[in-house]
């Protein structure tokens, strides 16, 4: 920590979502539901932070309701349907240290899109395992892209850098310098 205070400051990109600036991750599917509700559950002593999120995931899965999500880029719909994971990343990690933005870089000028479409309940543990192993990209239902701007339309609450925001339409664009 002390050494970091003497390092030269580096410029980073931001994601601008309407009038909200995002340094790390904007998410809006089951991943957002967990992030928005993790603090409503009692922490289990001696359980690492990442596993606290897994604990909440297991408790919330039966209560989760899917919401249609539409993602548009350059006037073309790139996704329309239900999602389990919907993360627009500038940084690589979210909630408890999970690596969601595998190719995200705060200085590359792109938003790193990471989606997992609705999956059968029998595959949930497999995808949790992939996420814990930082290999979500190995899942057949995983979608990835890198874009400079994208529009999101969702009826689910959105989580931006740990804060909860209302459902709706969000125009996301990368802001540099």
Each language-model region and where it sits:
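A generic structural signal for short beta-strands and their flanking turns/coil linkers
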Residues: 65-67, 82-84, 107-111, 146-148
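Gly/Ser/Thr-rich active-site loops/lids in small-molecule metabolic enzymes
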Residues: 43-52, 102-122
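Short acidic/glycine-rich loop or secondary-structure boundary segments that cap or lie
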Residues: 31-34, 79-81, 93-97, 121-124
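Glycine-rich phosphate/pyrophosphate-binding beta-alpha loops
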Residues: 31, 87-101, 164
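Catalytic core of DAGKc-family lipid kinases
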Residues: 1-84
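Short linear motifs in intrinsically disordered
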Residues: 2-11, 55-64, 103, 139-151, ...
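ATP/nucleoside-binding phosphotransfer catalytic cores, i.e., glycine-rich phosphate-binding loops
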Residues: 73-75, 80, 105, 115-177
């Amino acid at each position: 920590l002390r050494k970091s205070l003497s390092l030269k400051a580096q410029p980073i990109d931001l994601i601008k979502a309407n009038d909200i600036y995002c340094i790390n991750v904007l998410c809006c599917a089951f991943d957002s539901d967990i992030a928005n509700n993790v603090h409503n559950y009692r922490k289990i002593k001696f359980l690492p932070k990442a596993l606290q999120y897994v604990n909440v995931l297991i408790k919330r899965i039966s209560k989760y309701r899917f919401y249609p999500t539409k993602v548009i880029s350059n006037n073309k719909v790139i996704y329309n349907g239900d999602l389990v994971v919907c993360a627009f990343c500038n940084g690589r990690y979210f909630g408890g240290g999970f690596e969601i933005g595998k190719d995200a870089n705060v200085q590359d000028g792109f938003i790193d899109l990471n989606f997992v479409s609705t999956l059968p309940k029998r595959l949930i543990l497999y995808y949790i395992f992939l996420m814990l192993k930082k290999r979500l990209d190995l899942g057949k239902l995983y979608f990835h892209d890198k874009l400079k701007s994208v529009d999101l339309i969702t009826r689910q609450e959105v989580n931006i850098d740990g804060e909860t925001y209302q459902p709706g339409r969000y125009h996301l664009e990368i802001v540099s310098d």
